[in-house]
């Protein structure tokens, strides 16, 4: 993938099975991942500030305040993470993208779709100066 540094990822989904599947899927794609997990918006907000992930995979229906409000808050960060929004509801795409998501993936799509979008974002991280090997 062109990155020789660790990639900090935050998985935010209330469902343990979804987080586990995402972690397994991403670990097969890259070996230098540091992944943390959140189960609600409060945890996600705290982890964004302290962990400073480069990439967030966010369940649009995550318990707590609306995910859109949190995405808008990301804009105030010095280094906004890339965000892939996941939802079981395809109709949520417009709202997620308007709130600042970089990518929207419906949970009903094949895992390959998520991997394609993941690769695109990771390559973008490497080309915008955030990769320390450049």
Language-model-derived ranges and their functions:
Residues 13-14, 88:
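Acidic di-acidic motifs
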Residues 16-36:
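Two-component/phosphorelay signaling modules centered on CheY-like receiver
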Residues 37-55:
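Acidic, metal-coordinating helix/loop segments flanking the phosphotransfer/catalytic sites
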Residues 49-51, 73-80, 99:
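Conserved phosphotransfer cores of two-component systems
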